[in-house]
């Protein structure tokens, strides 16, 4: 949820691990990846170090998909810019990304963005580079895992059998 830090501990802010019931926590539980404090959505937790490494390392090209709202219009030309790899205002270039414009108006646009890397504040910086600011950001997919529509913000659940099979297949093939 917004306002929580994606970390195992933080001296100034509550963390995503603070949401866990005591019986669901182990000393080695940690989040796979990060969400900014103002970002919501899907976050995987694990106590399996090799799995976490494989899901995060850029060489494995795990895609993450986000619902994004920005404060201005987007045009088809932006789709091409994302496909070619956005260059941040500081000169850093991102890997190609997929941009799907759901709707666009002069004051606000809704999109889906799919990335295969995770630079610091990447989605926000990508949109700033094309002249708009992110006003809402929600991760809805992480690889083959989708945000469970039955969960409310801040809720969690263990992986189901199908999802465990996805993990097993992933580990066997990588």
Locations of regions flagged by a protein language model:
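Basic, flexible Lys/Arg- and Gly-enriched helix-loop patches that mediate nucleic-acid binding at interfaces
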Residues: 1-174
């Amino acid at each position: 949820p917004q306002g929580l830090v994606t970390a195992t501990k933080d001296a100034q802010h509550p963390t995503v691990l603070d949401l866990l019931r005591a019986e669901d926590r182990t000393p080695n539980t940690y989040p796979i990846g990060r969400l900014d404090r103002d970002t919501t959505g899907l976050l995987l937790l694990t106590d399996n170090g090799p799995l976490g490494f494989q899901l995060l390392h850029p060489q494995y090209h795990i895609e993450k998909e986000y619902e994004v709202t920005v404060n201005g219009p987007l045009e088809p030309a932006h789709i091409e810019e994302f496909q070619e790899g956005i260059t941040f205002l500081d000169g850093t270039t991102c890997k190609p990304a997929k941009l799907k414009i759901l709707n666009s108006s002069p004051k606000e646009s809704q999109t889906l963005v799919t990335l295969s890397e995770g630079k610091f504040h990447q989605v926000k910086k990508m949109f700033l580079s094309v002249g708009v600011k992110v006003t809402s950001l929600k991760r809805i997919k992480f690889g083959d895992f989708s945000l469970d529509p039955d969960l409310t913000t801040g809720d969690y659940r263990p992986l189901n059998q199908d999802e465990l099979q996805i993990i097993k297949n992933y580990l066997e093939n990588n």
